[in-house]
From Swiss-Prot:
Subunit structure: Binds to the N-terminal domain of the chaperone ClpA.
PANTHER family cross-referenced by the UniProt entry: ATP-DEPENDENT CLP PROTEASE ADAPTER PROTEIN CLPS (PTHR33473:SF19), ATP-DEPENDENT CLP PROTEASE ADAPTER PROTEIN CLPS1, CHLOROPLASTIC (PTHR33473)
Organism: Leptothrix cholodnii (strain ATCC 51168 / LMG 8142 / SP-6) (Leptothrix discophora (strain SP-6))
Summary of the function given for this chain in its UniProt record: Involved in the modulation of the specificity of the ClpAP-mediated ATP-dependent protein degradation.
Protein name: ATP-dependent Clp protease adapter protein ClpS
InterPro entries: ClpS (IPR022935), ClpS_core (IPR003769), Ribosomal_bL12_C/ClpS-like (IPR014719)
Similarity comment text for this entry: Belongs to the ClpS family.
Gene3D superfamilies xref list: 3.30.1390.10
GO BP terms: protein catabolic process; proteolysis
Length: 115
């Protein structure tokens, strides 16, 4: 038999306090914030403005004035951001808006985009 040492990586021993107790080193980890997504509502020629305002109030918690301003931006510019959320929340909001529009018989479209 040979007197070879097992092939182990060169790992430094953990620091100790001089009395045999190992001192744990704290390592800071950078955690990236979650990506955020804009929920965007698109204009169409058929969905009533009142329905759009109601959706903005109900699903995005905008007050009447803010909901009306967003609705007008959708109407005049063709689209507007309703809110910015994490991916799961944004996807849920899009589905809720589209489901409400389908139930009401409106073609209202809502999408999400990386903010």
């Amino acid at each position: 038999m040979s007197d070879q040492k097992p092939n182990t990586p060169n790992v430094p021993a953990p620091p100790d306090d001089g009395q045999g107790a190992v001192i744990a080193e704290k390592q800071l980890q950078r955690v990236e914030p979650p990506r955020v997504y804009q929920v965007v509502m698109l204009n169409d020629d058929f969905t009533p403005m009142e329905f759009v305002v109601m959706v903005l109030q109900q699903f995005f918690r905008h007050d009447l004035e803010a909901a009306t301003q967003i609705m007008l931006k959708i109407h005049h510019e063709g689209r507007a951001v309703c809110g910015v959320y994490t991916q799961d929340v944004a996807a849920t909001k899009v589905e809720m808006v589209q489901a409400a529009a389908r139930r009401a018989g409106h073609p209202l479209q809502c999408t999400m985009e990386v903010a």
